[in-house]
Design a protein with these regions (language model features):
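Short gly/ser-rich loop at a beta-strand->alpha-helix junction or flexible surface loop bordering the NTP-binding
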Residues: 1-170, 279-285
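Surface segments flanking catalytic/ligand-binding clefts of nucleic-acid enzymes
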Residues: 32, 150-285
Length: 285
C-alpha cells in the first residue's frame, strides 16, 4: 500500500471511529478512497450495509440514523445527555426533516421534525429531544425526564416551549405536560411520586423550604413531607442521623414525615402509602 493509500485509510477510519458508522456519501471518496474502502471491507476491518460504512461492532441505532441521514432522538438519545434511563430503549428512534420523502424502514421509529437541520451530528439537540418525548412519550416518565433536564440546566422551559407551538402534532398535550414539569425535582422517583399524587387529587409542592428543617422533596397537602430516599445517599451514619433529626424537627412543627424507598415508588405504592399515613395522622390529631 502506497503512501497515498495509507493516508486515505487513516482518513476513512478516523472519520468513522468517533460514532462507529457514517453514510458512504459523508466519506467523500475519490478513486483512491474507493479502492482503499473496498480493501477495508474485504479485510473485515469495516462493513457496509444500506450505504452505511461501519465498524463490525457499531451500535445498530447509529447505523439506523446514518442510513436515514437523520439524528437519534427519544429513548435513543437519553444516555447522550445523561437523562434518566426510565424508559425501555427498544428499537432506534430517528428524527428526519419533516419534508423528507417517503420512508418506511423496518425496525426503526421515524419522527418527522419541522425545522430540523441534519449536519454531521448524531443526536438531536436536547430541547428537540424533550419536545418530542412530551408529544408522544408516556406521561409520568416523560415529565420525570424533563424535570431532570430542567434541574440540571440542560435546557430551559422556554427552549422546549418554542418547539411546541400550534394546535397540531400533539402540541397542546405536550404544552400541558410541560406545565406539570418543575426544575425543583432532584430525582426521577421524586418526580414520579409527585405526578402520581397529583393525579390522585393531592396538592403537591416540590422543593418547599421549611425554616429549621430545610428543603422538602414533595410537600403533600401542606402537611406531609414525602421523602423518596435512595440508599446511596442515605446509607452513611451521618446521613442516617440527619434524617432522624429532620423528622423530629418536622414533627415538632406539626408536619408528618414519610420516607419511601425506590422500590415503593416504582412498584406504584406511593398513593396508598401516603393516603394511609395522612388518614392515621388525621385520626391522631
Amino acid at each position: 500500500m502506497g503512501i497515498a493509500a495509507r493516508l486515505e485509510k487513516d482518513r476513512i477510519i478516523g472519520l468513522i471511529l468517533p460514532t462507529g458508522a457514517l453514510h458512504r456519501s459523508a466519506l467523500h471518496l475519490d478513486s483512491t478512497g474507493r479502492r482503499v474502502l473496498s480493501r477495508l471491507l474485504a479485510e473485515g476491518v469495516l462493513r457496509s450495509r444500506w450505504n452505511v460504512v461501519h465498524l463490525p461492532d457499531a451500535d445498530p441505532a447509529v447505523i439506523a440514523a446514518r442510513r436515514l441521514r437523520g439524528l437519534l432522538t427519544c429513548t435513543s438519545a437519553l444516555a447522550r445527555y445523561g437523562l434518566p434511563d426510565i424508559l425501555p430503549v427498544g428499537v432506534p428512534h430517528v428524527a428526519v426533516p419533516a419534508n423528507r420523502g417517503r420512508l418506511d424502514p423496518k425496525g426503526v421509529v421515524v419522527h418527522r421534525e419541522p425545522g430540523l437541520v441534519v449536519g454531521g451530528e448524531l443526536f438531536v439537540p436536547p430541547e428537540r429531544l424533550l419536545a418530542r418525548l412530551l408529544r408522544c412519550g408516556p406521561e409520568k416518565e416523560t415529565i420525570a425526564i424533563v424535570d431532570s433536564a430542567l434541574n440540571h440546566h440542560l435546557v430551559t422551559r422556554e427552549e422546549i416551549a418554542a418547539l411546541l407551538t400550534g394546535k397540531g402534532n400533539d402540541c397542546p398535550r405536550a404544552r400541558r405536560r410541560l406545565g406539570r414539569c418543575t426544575e425543583r425535582a432532584r430525582s426521577s422517583i421524586e418526580s414520579i411520586a409527585r405526578i402520581e399524587l397529583q393525579d390522585a387529587g393531592h396538592l403537591v409542592e416540590s422543593g418547599v423550604m421549611v425554616p429549621g428543617v430545610g428543603e422538602l422533596d414533595n410537600f403533600v397537602d401542606r402537611i406531609l413531607d414525602l421523602e423518596t430516599d435512595g440508599f446511596a445517599h442515605h446509607s452513611s451514619y451521618s446521613a442516617w442521623m440527619r434524617d432522624r433529626q429532620r423528622d423530629q424537627a418536622l414533627l415538632a412543627r406539626g408536619l408528618l414525615p414519610l420516607r419511601l424507598t425506590y422500590d415503593d415508588v416504582m412498584a406504584g405504592r406511593t398513593v396508598s402509602l401516603v393516603e394511609a399515613a395522612l388518614a392515621g395522622f388525621g385520626r391522631r390529631n
